[in-house]
Amino acid sequence: MILPEPIHKVILVIIELGILLGSLGVVLLTNIVYSALLLGLVFICISLLYLVLNADFVAAAQVLIYVGAVNVLTVFAVMLIDKPKNITLFSFSNVGDNITLGVCTSLFILLTIMIPDASWSEIYMTKQSTKFVEQGLTTDVQLIGSQLLTKFLLPFELLSILLLVALIGAITIARQERIVEIDDNKASESKEDLSLF
């Protein structure tokens, strides 16, 4: 953004105050949900700082990656830390597990059948045509997008799979901890009931 010098300084001071106050709130608040939301405010202020400095792509990436990650952090914080007292277990949990197993197995078999039949020459032609595509790209954002979807497509997809596996692992760990805690609570309640007699 091209702004007059006094307005530029005022905007920078406001953004820096947002970063400073948000960071203090993240560290000093005891509620994990409020801390995560203030961390989102800090990341938004940092993206505004990049926007003022004419780094449009970095500002957009900051919002998409970090603010999106803060939403996931909020969900994990509530899921892993704020555990409710009374939980009723769903008795048909094996049905859901079996359905998930069936869907994943069928997708695996489908991909195993379709991958050998794919015409890889079209993918080769796509790589060859990037020379012509890059000639029409004028901005840095277009060049970065072109590189992400041609040259760095495999690392980009592997990173998304890694993040998905981490998400599934965190959900599984949180679920197992809750089940163990419920079993411990039931055992302690039964001991208390026996001590009454």
From Swiss-Prot:
Its EC number is 7.1.1.-. It holds the Pfam family Oxidored_q3. It is a multi-pass membrane protein. Coiled coil: none annotated. InterPro entries: NAD(P)H-Q_Oxidoreduct_6, NADH_UbQ/plastoQ_OxRdtase_su6, Nuo/plastoQ_OxRdtase_6_NuoJ. It comes from the Eukaryota. It is an enzyme of class 7 (translocase). The chain crosses the membrane at residues 10-30, 32-52, 61-81, 95-115, 153-173. One of its GO terms (cellular component) is chloroplast thylakoid membrane. It catalyses: a plastoquinone + NADH + (n+1) H(+)(in) = a plastoquinol + NAD(+) + n H(+)(out); a plastoquinone + NADPH + (n+1) H(+)(in) = a plastoquinol + NADP(+) + n H(+)(out). Keywords: Chloroplast, Membrane, NAD, NADP, Plastid, Plastoquinone, Quinone, Thylakoid, Translocase, Transmembrane, Transmembrane helix, Transport. It is found in: Plastid, Chloroplast thylakoid membrane. GO terms for molecular function: NADH dehydrogenase (ubiquinone) activity; quinone binding. Belongs to the complex I subunit 6 family. NDH shuttles electrons from NAD(P)H:plastoquinone, via FMN and iron-sulfur (Fe-S) centers, to quinones in the photosynthetic chain and possibly in a chloroplast respiratory chain. The immediate electron acceptor for the enzyme in this species is believed to be plastoquinone. Couples the redox reaction to proton translocation, and thus conserves the redox energy in a proton gradient. NDH is composed of at least 16 different subunits, 5 of which are encoded in the nucleus. PANTHER family: NAD(P)H-QUINONE OXIDOREDUCTASE SUBUNIT 6, CHLOROPLASTIC. This is NAD(P)H-quinone oxidoreductase subunit 6, chloroplastic. It comes from Angiopteris evecta.
